[in-house]
């Protein structure tokens, strides 16, 4: 009996995708390719899926990352065989470190065509190595392989992802032919072997993990410090509520979307007199991870290390992820639960040392006022990246905020003060690639206006993903801070003789024609007032994407930082 392989390929694809949908996959991202036809056609025919496409697999991976980041759901990707698969690695590596759930469906040649010189065939087994939580290498579809085996195999991978997060990889070896008009009912008997599952709405297998919640020790006699890292806004707000309840100072990373009276800590922690006001802290409670400030991480290591030398400072960490997040290898108590759930269990807590760091908060107000006086007091003055960082809270009101990597995210960490803003970043591997694509994915999932900040080198790296904004009707402002290369290296002790040629790599490019190529609006303001006006006006009455290029001298931000540091030491 001859087998219609194309139909069998589609039956397996339909089975996999239906089960993924029951695991919560609603968005599917597809790149063009022939070998992936069975998956592509079945995804397109499934009314439960929202389909997203991109011609570049690297950008596709980051778009899926943004969708998963914003929706808090697993997102599937479908790509063809060969280097298309390899191009997904950067996004998968980021997801490994930040926990977004990607389900990577890669089409492959059958085993007999791998390693023998066949076209577009590479070894895809284990290609993502330790960057995925689990992987499944499927054989070529045959009638002798039961569909219930296929389902339990997919379920096992998805159960692992449910527990550990990050990406999982399902490699699908499809033999030719790949195209057929024959109906799948030709193999109705094969389909009926899982008829009960097909008629239901639940996953083939189900697994229930017991939840354990360790008691939270009383901390009312501690002088505590609350640190809020990268978290969804609702979780960050819960963490700040705990700090307010205890009367303790709060150091909020800009990725949290909240702030406090102890803002700008990456600036004032370098001032010995100000930093010393935290010396009495004997308990640090950190919610969420990925703190941007290197100065805070150094302070944390130094302060908590006293515990190993006869001191008594404790370090608590609250994050639902099971992975180790302890770069200084400190003695740490980790509650693997959502901050909101942890805070709810402390509703009766109070502290006898409430307000112990209020004097420091009063000093920090002077830092805020001084920064505003230096950099944004005259809206008609020349634009600077620090001015943009100070102004970000005003421009981001009522919209989502996506912040790229390198210099600008650090300036927001130093000078920004966000007020209940939903913030998105790629601060796992902290690469400069895929940022436009990730931002597009976030906006597609949330359907909100978006303000994005990205550096010029990052923009060049992901330029073709501007195509993802071409047909968007939602207003978005893509601010490109163009300092002509990697100005961040001015902050690092790189060899002076090689600084420009091998680190900064100035390019001399502007972005007006790039915006036009992808049908996007473009403006290049010359003053802070003009910048503020055009951003606010676009969110008020515009639609689609507006590229705003802010051009500054390459050494401006670093010179401003050096000057401000001197002023800070003079103030205190």
Curated annotation (Swiss-Prot):
<comment type="subunit">
    <text>Homodimer.</text>
</comment>
<dbReference type="InterPro" id="IPR004433">
    <property type="entry name" value="MenaQ_synth_MenD"/>
</dbReference>
<keyword id="KW-0479">Metal-binding</keyword>
<dbReference type="GO" id="GO:0030976">
    <property type="term" value="F:thiamine pyrophosphate binding"/>
</dbReference>
<dbReference type="Pfam" id="PF02776">
    <property type="entry name" value="TPP_enzyme_N"/>
</dbReference>
<dbReference type="InterPro" id="IPR029061">
    <property type="entry name" value="THDP-binding"/>
</dbReference>
<protein>
    <recommendedName>
        <fullName>2-succinyl-5-enolpyruvyl-6-hydroxy-3-cyclohexene-1-carboxylate synthase</fullName>
        <ecNumber>2.2.1.9</ecNumber>
    </recommendedName>
</protein>
<comment type="similarity">
    <text>Belongs to the TPP enzyme family. MenD subfamily.</text>
</comment>
<dbReference type="GO" id="GO:0070204">
    <property type="term" value="F:2-succinyl-5-enolpyruvyl-6-hydroxy-3-cyclohexene-1-carboxylic-acid synthase activity"/>
</dbReference>
<dbReference type="InterPro" id="IPR011766">
    <property type="entry name" value="TPP_enzyme_TPP-bd"/>
</dbReference>
<dbReference type="Pfam" id="PF16582">
    <property type="entry name" value="TPP_enzyme_M_2"/>
</dbReference>
<dbReference type="GO" id="GO:0000287">
    <property type="term" value="F:magnesium ion binding"/>
</dbReference>
<keyword id="KW-0464">Manganese</keyword>
<keyword id="KW-0786">Thiamine pyrophosphate</keyword>
<dbReference type="Pfam" id="PF02775">
    <property type="entry name" value="TPP_enzyme_C"/>
</dbReference>
<keyword id="KW-0808">Transferase</keyword>
<keyword id="KW-0474">Menaquinone biosynthesis</keyword>
<comment type="function">
    <text>Catalyzes the thiamine diphosphate-dependent decarboxylation of 2-oxoglutarate and the subsequent addition of the resulting succinic semialdehyde-thiamine pyrophosphate anion to isochorismate to yield 2-succinyl-5-enolpyruvyl-6-hydroxy-3-cyclohexene-1-carboxylate (SEPHCHC).</text>
</comment>
<dbReference type="InterPro" id="IPR012001">
    <property type="entry name" value="Thiamin_PyroP_enz_TPP-bd_dom"/>
</dbReference>
<keyword id="KW-0460">Magnesium</keyword>
<comment type="pathway">
    <text>Quinol/quinone metabolism; menaquinone biosynthesis.</text>
</comment>
<comment type="pathway">
    <text>Quinol/quinone metabolism; 1,4-dihydroxy-2-naphthoate biosynthesis; 1,4-dihydroxy-2-naphthoate from chorismate: step 2/7.</text>
</comment>
<dbReference type="InterPro" id="IPR032264">
    <property type="entry name" value="MenD_middle"/>
</dbReference>
<dbReference type="GO" id="GO:0030145">
    <property type="term" value="F:manganese ion binding"/>
</dbReference>
<dbReference type="GO" id="GO:0009234">
    <property type="term" value="P:menaquinone biosynthetic process"/>
</dbReference>
